[in-house]
Amino acid sequence: MASHIVGYPRMGPKRELKFALESFWDGKSTAEDLKKVSADLRSSIWKQMADAGIKYIPSNTFSYYDQVLDTTAMLGAVPPRYGWTGGEIEFDVYFSMARGNASVPAMEMTKWFDTNYHFIVPELGPEVNFSYASHKAVLEYKEAKALGVDTVPVLVGPVSYLLLSKQAKGVDKSFDLLSLLPKILPIYKEVVAELKEAGASWIQFDEPLLVMDLESHKLQAFSAAYADLESTLSGLNVVVETYFADVTAEAYKTLISLKGVTGYGFDLVRGTKTLDLVKAEFPSGKYLFAGVVDGRNIWANDLAASLATLEALEGVVGKDKLVVSTSCSFLHTAVDLINETKLDDEIKSWLAFAAQKVLEVNALAKALSGQKDEAFFSANAAALASRKSSPRVTNEAVQKAATALKGSDHRRATTVSSRLDAQQKKLNLPILPTTTIGSFPQTVELRRVRREYKAKKISEEEYVKAIKEEISKVVKLQEELDIDVLVHGEPERNDMVEYFGEQLSGFAFSANGWVQSYGSRCVKPPIIYGDVSRPNPMTVFWSSMAQSMTARPMKGMLTGPVTILNWSFVRNDQPRHETCYQIALAIKNEVEDLEKAGINVIQIDEAALREGLPLRKSEHDFYLKWAVHSFRITNVGVQDTTQIHTHMCYSNFNDIIHSIIDMDADVITIENSRSDEKLLSVFREGVKYGAGIGPGVYDIHSPRIPPTEELADRIRKMLAVLESNVLWVNPDCGLKTRKYGEVNPALSNMVAAAKQLRQELASAK
């Protein structure tokens, strides 16, 4: 019985690729050094899979930055601003597209479906001259072959590539990107022909767009593309891989009738309805790549349940045509549990990172072919049983409190406009009040203090003294700049989710559970393994200390429940919304303690609320309902005079604006500076938003210092669609990643712009 892996993490078990990339970018190592580290990583991954008994091992899933960017390079679709003049695309052009350079900005980066990975968006139009400009797929196939490993080269499919693209600057938004299919297919044919010549017998096209809600003309593009490729693909086995959700009945019909295709890959972890489609109709003689091992989480597979699913499928597709596979690439999970020496043994026994998941895939394939490893299956069953019965997982008080939430929608008793009046009487803020989003620059010295405290190299007393000095510096700076509502700067926090997770029960943390977010940037999601509660106050000590240093309002700073959920590895033994409600109750306790401590402005960040939106429109309402409800739970009990802020980190709100209004926050600040018009257009079209709103006036992701007049002009544009009594003036995000040399003048200009507009408004009366 055959086994298959859709894709594997690239960073290496100890983030070797990250450090090699950053060393190369900083000019501390050569291109050859980077290539050597990368070749060693690829070789160890291929050998690991071969040794584990995997039959269909992927190649070309490694990337120096991103697989969609690799496809852009393969097709020679380099935007003109990068000055590429043809020939094989090398690191200089490749990394300029990914990261920008001294003279030109990077290409846009956006989220890969509903994961926390980001891809580089192709910029296309009728003028693009496509040409075969990166032979990476063929070179990596040959590289593996030279090591004695026959692999399945993986390409981003042609239709998904075009549907993931955007119209280049200056190209009309009505331009149909799919009209470029006839221009890119000849290059795909060249790549396929070279792979065939190099000895490839299988090839994998990733077409994840098939899980989206697609109009019929888009589905027809798949049929047309593969019909065109059919003669080139003859003599090869071809698998078309989908992942992250169910395929619709229409997409399934399209997929199983594609010309030249031998097998189909499905996510059977998130795609439970797809299973019914397969059982109802599957083309005879074709292969089913059954994605039963979860590529997006870190829990051990329920091998007995997966085996039962696979045995049922055997009857449908035939024993020799069923391939045990993964739900998606392992890019979205951590690399190897072997490096977790500090994780609690019991919790560790419940987990499987990518390296362990490879073994699970192989164990299932062997069991199907009558060679079941009884010891492996028994150990798995014992781990699952221990997880189910462990007292660490279940907290009855939490379960009871969460159950009691049902039946109420947890709204504050009064309207937002009457609350804002009460808050204004208490806070006495000027018109167009200024604030920042929360974090201030994290200096090398500050990181050292935190690291030494964690390693017990300095005492708690020394740590508190150092953090107190930092808070005092940040408060003083904001007073000198004349900012109206202050923040403490978050010097005690390394990460906005980890900081809270470390103080909540039900969370565990890995040492090396890194997952690629984009380029060399990795994140280490907390693991939510059990019921969540708050044993002690988490932020009250620091917020109270900061408030005692100033007469101005000091914001309490919390991360919201939906963001904590969406940026964690979440337990899979209960629905996500139940876990979210538990986190909401823990945050509610904190909000109430901050209020008691005299904090009158409390910000509950929901940076990732939109990120959790399901891929299919039919599932949006249910998600938004519980996500928004979770937010309201956190602050339902506070007084009218306590002002609740929230912050959101993305530009495309238009489709969820009514849910944002339904959150019932008093003030919302938004990461908006890069897409001004997009957001303001919602309000221009007459959506009445009665609460305070602070669309970011400048982009903190850039070191550029915006001049006062530019900021004043931006505020004027906002005042054209928003009432002056609800508009706040703030940067678009936290300042953690910037330097003080950039932050001070930028904030100074921001305050000056707000004061200028106050004068203009006063003289216009």
Swiss-Prot record:
Catalytically driven reaction(s): 5-methyltetrahydropteroyltri-L-glutamate + L-homocysteine = tetrahydropteroyltri-L-glutamate + L-methionine
EC number: 2.1.1.14
UniProt: L-homocysteine binding residues: I437, G438, S439, E490, D605
Keywords for the protein's UniProt record, in alphabetical order: Amino-acid biosynthesis, Cytoplasm, Metal-binding, Methionine biosynthesis, Methyltransferase, Transferase, Zinc
Residues annotated as binding Zn(2+) 1: H647, C649, E671, C733
Enzyme kind, highest EC tier: transferase
InterPro entries cross-referenced by the UniProt entry: Cbl-indep_Met_Synth_N, Cobalamin-indep_Met_synthase, Met_Synth_C/arc, UROD/MetE-like_sf
Presence of the UniProt keyword Amino-acid biosynthesis in the record: yes
GO molecular function, one term: zinc ion binding
Residues forming the catalytic site: H701
GO biological process terms, semicolon-separated: methionine biosynthetic process; methylation
Binding site for 5-methyltetrahydropteroyltri-L-glutamate: K18, N116, D495, Y518, R521, C522, W567
Subcellular location: Cytoplasm
Pathway: Amino-acid biosynthesis; L-methionine biosynthesis via de novo pathway; L-methionine from L-homocysteine (MetE route): step 1/1
Cofactor: Zn(2+)
Gene3D superfamilies xref list: 3.20.20.210
HAMAP family (UniProt xref): Meth_synth
Function statement: Catalyzes the transfer of a methyl group from 5-methyltetrahydrofolate to homocysteine resulting in methionine formation.
Protein family membership: Belongs to the vitamin-B12 independent methionine synthase family.
Protein name: 5-methyltetrahydropteroyltriglutamate--homocysteine methyltransferase
Species annotation: Mesembryanthemum crystallinum (Common ice plant)
